[in-house]
């Protein structure tokens, strides 16, 4: 019998998959060229996961955040190459547009 991943590990796995999938979309569309995996994962953790953790506490908030991150993916992160659902595309576009600052060009 398989034991489910702990919520913290599951969130980290989905966070990485969502970030990788979004970076792939951005690369194809030549958007957010300054974006890094590290900065994107930090934004997802702070903005998306952090919202639910602040609202509902560690245990329930983490479960809700995991459910959201799962919904952002077309399939599980271990089943196929990371790919975002339509909801995932919308949420990540909004996250980047609102919370990730473009570098200043001189």
Curated annotation (Swiss-Prot):
It comes from the Viruses. This is Uncharacterized protein ORF106. The lineage of its organism: Viruses, Duplodnaviria, Heunggongvirae, Uroviricota, Caudoviricetes.
